[in-house]
């Protein structure tokens, strides 16, 4: 009997829940408009719902009237943004994920200690831009092994590395191995920079891949961790599609006869996942739905103190 195997955990992580609730509580407490620096999370469904409630998403603080409230997104901001907000008298609420904040703090600390910092990540991603702002003269971003091999540091330099929190564990492991081979003296945080939720979702997906022929990753095209989930499946030879709504699930699936895997990025709402499952069951009425639990998640991040 053909199955659709749903990964667990999937969808919202603790950092995303905190960020979304921060905007919702701010709207409840102070009313619209509430300004948000960058999309609060990279998911169109989430952003559209919050926009309908009165959130205004901006990229430049100049768009925010003086003395207004502005929320920093889960991805974090560079210190220059905080300084500009202070100069303009803006009331700020920080929804930066705690795991991203940990990396900001580490980069700042090691830069002060004289270390040169290598950041593994996508240099145009808003999270990476924010981290780089902590020590712009001491950070080098690398996106792939070729860029690692092109580094010109000495084996005598003090070197420290971190990664963007939403990377593929496969790709980052290869780059970390290359870094350590070139620079045996390089150090990092005691625990991985890749967040627990990213790791759990990738591991949960890897766990079902031997049992499926096709995978749907439900997430926004702009979501880094959703794209990395697709890459995890593709790297292991499983056909994978990134879809953001049920309409993107087509009768293409009828060309396949094996089991189907379903997972969702950390910023994907569960109602979107369920709508996609409903579409699948309409296309294949005989599908049996099965959940594959990899690990229970119980992490909770407290809301900013202004909203507790």
Swiss-Prot record:
Residues annotated to bind (2E)-4-hydroxy-3-methylbut-2-enyl diphosphate: 42, 75, 125, 165, 223-225, 267
Cofactor stoichiometry and binding remark: Binds 1 [4Fe-4S] cluster per subunit.
Record's catalysed reaction(s): isopentenyl diphosphate + 2 oxidized [2Fe-2S]-[ferredoxin] + H2O = (2E)-4-hydroxy-3-methylbut-2-enyl diphosphate + 2 reduced [2Fe-2S]-[ferredoxin] + 2 H(+); dimethylallyl diphosphate + 2 oxidized [2Fe-2S]-[ferredoxin] + H2O = (2E)-4-hydroxy-3-methylbut-2-enyl diphosphate + 2 reduced [2Fe-2S]-[ferredoxin] + 2 H(+)
Pathway: Isoprenoid biosynthesis; dimethylallyl diphosphate biosynthesis; dimethylallyl diphosphate from (2E)-4-hydroxy-3-methylbutenyl diphosphate: step 1/1; Isoprenoid biosynthesis; isopentenyl diphosphate biosynthesis via DXP pathway; isopentenyl diphosphate from 1-deoxy-D-xylulose 5-phosphate: step 6/6
Keyword annotations: 4Fe-4S, Iron, Iron-sulfur, Isoprene biosynthesis, Metal-binding, Oxidoreductase
GO biological-process terms attached to the record: dimethylallyl diphosphate biosynthetic process; isopentenyl diphosphate biosynthetic process, methylerythritol 4-phosphate pathway; terpenoid biosynthetic process
Short name of one Pfam family: LYTB
Names of required cofactors: [4Fe-4S] cluster
Residues reported in the UniProt entry to bind dimethylallyl diphosphate: 42, 75, 125, 223-225, 267
Keyword field contains Lipid biosynthesis: no
Gene3D superfamilies: 3.40.50.11270, 4-hydroxy-3-methylbut-2-enyl diphosphate reductase, catalytic domain
Residues engaged in binding [4Fe-4S] cluster: 13, 97, 195
EC number from the UniProt entry: 1.17.7.4
Active-site feature positions: 127 (proton donor)
GO molecular function, one term: 4-hydroxy-3-methylbut-2-enyl diphosphate reductase activity
Membrane-crossing segments per the record: none
Positions annotated to bind isopentenyl diphosphate: 42, 75, 125, 223-225, 267
Family, per entry: Belongs to the IspH family.
PANTHER family, alphabetized: 4-HYDROXY-3-METHYLBUT-2-ENYL DIPHOSPHATE REDUCTASE (PTHR30426:SF0)
Function: Catalyzes the conversion of 1-hydroxy-2-methyl-2-(E)-butenyl 4-diphosphate (HMBPP) into a mixture of isopentenyl diphosphate (IPP) and dimethylallyl diphosphate (DMAPP). Acts in the terminal step of the DOXP/MEP pathway for isoprenoid precursor biosynthesis.
HAMAP family attached to this UniProt entry: IspH (MF_00191)
Protein name: 4-hydroxy-3-methylbut-2-enyl diphosphate reductase
Natural source organism: Chlamydia muridarum (strain MoPn / Nigg)
